[in-house]
């Protein structure tokens, strides 16, 4: 997709970092935005950055690991924007700890956000994106999806999983008018 003007993008983790910068960049190109983050204050800061962009912006405070919240957000996006052309599954967390040093709850937290959040975002938005006639699913991973690092076992595992999920999804959608990266 080369032209973002009047397209609609959903972005997870839009309250800071890469997600916030994606929102700013896409808005400058005339793309309407549906933004989500677990941090309402971060979302408000992103909206402030977009005030002069002249695009529609909706926000949803949610945890990407909450399947029902993701379903509601997808429906809300279509209700407010009419359609959706792309999703940036960007939300992620890290924990600098060895496997032995991390609790089960911390390990599950990383997996639920970094992997299942991507799956839920894809599953809920993909039918809507395909319906738009042209679209794209963009799953943000990291270099840790290519190489492992000590004290990042859980994070590495989720990023390798996202990479595998994305490559498989790309093959599944190869014959349809929907890109995956």
Task: Place the predicted regions along the sequence by residue.
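Substrate-binding pocket helix/loop in short-chain dehydrogenase/reductase
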Residues: 98-99, 103-108
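Active-site loop immediately N-terminal to the catalytic Tyr-X3-Lys motif
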Residues: 99-100, 147-153, 169
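A glycine-rich helix->loop->beta "capping" turn
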Residues: 55-56, 76-89, 95
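The beta1-alpha1 cofactor-binding region of Rossmann-like NAD(H)/NADP(H)-dependent oxidoreductases
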Residues: 40-41, 61-72, 104
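Residue(s) in the substrate-gating loop at a strand-loop-helix junction
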Residues: 142
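Active-site helix of classical SDR
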Residues: 122, 158
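Canonical Rossmann dinucleotide-binding motif of NAD(H)/NADP(H)-dependent dehydrogenases/reductases
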Residues: 2-33
